[in-house]
A protein has these predicted regions:
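Compact nucleic-acid interaction/catalytic patches
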Residues: 20-22, 27-62
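Generic serine detector
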Residues: 17-20, 29, 70, 79-81
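C-terminal terminal-subdomain/extension
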Residues: 64-110
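Short, charged beta-turn/beta-strand-edge "cap" motif at the junction between a beta-strand
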Residues: 12-16
Length: 110
């Protein structure tokens, strides 16, 4: 599991307005952490595009293998067990990964 990869994950059980269900997530934690820890830090994706500031909208392409446009929900960042990640479907470009890290830094200042 590497930074920038897109995986299907089981996110249940959840509390409140946390993103739930079997859904796509983007791994954002660094590769060294991913190599040694039993968890990864990730952002859930949604196909309900709201264009919130600080969220990246991904269009389907051959690299990410998405079937429809998806918004990365940076404000729903969470740590999940690697056991929750079930199937890798693709990855982000290097630029998209850099942008997500910048957006994460921005939401930490709000």
């Amino acid at each position: 599991m590497k930074q920038g990869e897109i995986w299907y994950a089981h996110l249940d059980p959840v509390k409140g307005s946390e993103q739930s269900g079997y859904r796509l997530v983007v791994v954002i934690s660094g590769n060294l952490l991913n190599q040694y820890l039993p968890v990864v830090i990730c952002f859930p994706l949604t196909t309900k595009i709201k264009n919130y500031k600080g969220n990246l909208v991904l269009q389907p392409d051959a690299m990410n293998n998405l079937t429809q446009a998806s918004e990365v929900l940076t404000f729903h960042i969470r740590s999940v067990s690697k056991e929750r990640l079930k199937k890798k479907i693709g990855k982000l470009t290097e630029l998209q990964t850099i942008l997500l890290k910048q957006y994460l830094n921005e939401i930490l200042t709000y």
